[in-house]
Every structure is written in structure tokens, then in C-alpha cells.
């Protein structure tokens, strides 16, 4: 599986986990996606997208 495809699947998995009420699992998926993007040297726009989702989770944690 190509790295970009795997990263996208991890992002979607994280999104689905948020909808299921599993923010901790979502964070794990996003972190794995970000790490893979960095390893592959493709963390530009994908990295920014993942970091935005992680920041949203952090904001939800501080609100709750």
C-alpha cells in the first residue's frame, strides 16, 4: 500500500473514531498518520491537515 493511501485511511479512521465517541483512538490514528507522513517526507499539506485535527481534539479536551 502506498504511503499516501495509508495516511488517508488513517485520517478517515480517526474521523470515524471521533464520530463514534472515541477521541483517544482518533488521536492514535492521527498520530500514526502524521508519523508516517513525516517518515515519507510528505508531511506538507497532509501534515498540516493532521495537525489541525489533533489541535481540534486538544481544544475539545480543554473544553470538556
Spans of model-derived segments:
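Alpha-helical junction/boundary sensor with strong preference for TPR arrays
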Residues: 37-40, 44
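Residue signature of alpha-solenoid helical repeat architecture, marking inter-repeat boundaries
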Residues: 4-5, 45
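Alpha-helical linker/edge segments of TPR/alpha-solenoid repeat scaffolds
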Residues: 52-64
Amino acid at each position: 500500500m502506498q504511503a499516501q493511501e495509508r495516511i488517508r485511511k488513517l485520517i478517515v479512521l480517526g474521523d470515524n473514531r471521533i464520530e463514534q465517541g472515541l477521541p483517544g483512538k482518533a488521536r492514535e490514528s492521527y498520530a500514526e498518520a502524521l508519523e508516517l507522513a513525516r517518515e515519507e517526507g510528505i508531511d506538507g499539506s497532509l501534515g498540516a491537515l493532521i495537525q489541525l485535527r489533533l489541535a481540534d481534539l486538544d481544544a475539545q479536551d480543554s473544553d470538556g
